[in-house]
From Swiss-Prot:
This is Anthocyanidin reductase. Regulated by TRANSPARENT TESTA 2, TRANSPARENT TESTA 8 and TRANSPARENT TESTA GLABRA 1. The keyword NADP applies. Belongs to the NAD(P)-dependent epimerase/dehydratase family. Dihydroflavonol-4-reductase subfamily. It comes from Arabidopsis thaliana (Mouse-ear cress). Pathway: Secondary metabolite biosynthesis; flavonoid biosynthesis. Optimum pH is 8.0. Keywords: Flavonoid biosynthesis, NAD, NADP, Oxidoreductase.
Length: 340
């Protein structure tokens, strides 16, 4: 693995998991920045799932490769000639009855397989791994005004003992990221991890990604997503957002920033369940908004700090108004919400 960060000729990057929401927006930003881009998908024959990638090919040199996180040997061709590897994909199965088998072990093995492939590459200079705020903010601390930064890790022992709603996902993100750091240090891989809050804003996908469905649940009224958002605050202590375009820009920014190192929280806005409902009622009066919640959700316990990222020179472009304006527009365009 090449440790220098100087460019030679055309810049080239690989985005793992191109069918995802963040991955597709990241690919768009890379192409618009002059990169040649390779992306991996599990099934390149599924035209519905890669339709947005076909459209993105109009922006520049985008090649689609078949690869699977469970198969170490499937990444070699997609990594060829790439300076940066963006490991955005993660196994998600919230309906699983065996999260260890379906999420935790595949996430860990996927990280190892990707990093092993990077070691074999002669071109890879830096790996950017997408972690999650779920790897930082979940604990049994009490009180309010808690500030979480990159030094904090989610309490896996607490999650294992209590097994709260969707407990497998945060454990998978913690253990996968820690595995990435251990492997990178042992093998001298230049690794940066990005820790995003709940991803909001627009989408290039034909079906709404789960993060947008959660964010819009007080308007759609979908019980599963309403429960998910409320449980997120109970577990994490707040609801924190980042716009998908800001998050994609942060990935590219940290790839190219020579001084970047370690973990970076990427969060633009910290709030709570009732505050979201109040905001939606005021800004979008033509929609029915769920606004009755149990006690204990009114005050956010903690905030996620992006100060380290800001200190590197990054600036967020989108606030909560723009995030929700774009989600409203997206859901309206899909016929998923109706006015009163």
């Amino acid at each position: 693995m090449d440790q220098t960060l100087t460019h030679t000729g055309s810049k080239k990057a690989c985005v793992i998991g191109g069918t995802g929401n963040l991955a597709s927006i990241l690919i768009k930003h890379l192409l618009q920045s002059g990169y040649k881009v390779n992306t991996t998908v599990r099934d390149p024959e599924n035209e519905k799932k890669i339709a947005h990638l076909r459209k993105l090919q109009e922006l520049g040199d985008l090649k689609i490769f078949k690869a699977d996180l469970t198969d170490e040997d499937s990444f070699e061709s997609s990594f060829s000639g790439c300076e940066y590897i963006f490991h955005v994909a993660t196994p998600i199965n919230f309906k699983s009855e065996d999260p260890e088998k379906d999420m935790i072990k595949p996430a860990i093995q996927g990280v190892i397989n990707v990093l092993k492939s990077c070691l074999k590459s002669k071109s890879v200079k830096r790996v950017i791994y997408t972690s999650s705020a779920a790897a930082v903010s979940i604990n049994n601390l009490s009180g309010t005004g808690i500030v979480m930064n990159e030094e904090n890790w989610t309490d896996v022992e607490f999650l294992t003992e209590e097994k709260p709603f969707n407990w497998g996902y945060p454990i998978s993100k913690v253990l996968a990221e820690k595995t990435a750091w251990e492997f990178a240090k042992e093998n001298k891989i230049n690794l940066v991890t990005v820790i995003p809050a709940l991803i909001a804003g627009n989408s290039l996908l034909s079906d709404p990604p789960s993060s947008l469905s959660l964010s819009m649940s007080f308007i759609t009224g979908k019980e599963m997503h309403v429960t998910g958002l409320k449980e997120m605050q109970k577990l994490s202590g707040s609801i924190s957002f980042v716009h998908v375009d800001d998050l994609a820009r942060a990935h590219l920014f940290l790839a190219e920033k020579e001084t970047a190192s370690g973990r970076y929280i990427c969060c633009a806005y910290n709030t709570s369940v009732p505050e979201i409902a109040d905001f939606l009622i005021q800004r979008y009066p033509k929609y029915n908004v769920l606004s009755e919640f149990e006690e204990g959700l009114s005050i956010p316990k903690l905030t996620l700090s992006s100060q380290k990222l800001i200190n590197e020179g990054f600036r967020f472009e989108y606030g909560i108004n723009e995030m929700y304006d774009q989600m409203i527009e997206y859901f309206e365009s899909k016929g998923l919400i109706k006015a009163k």
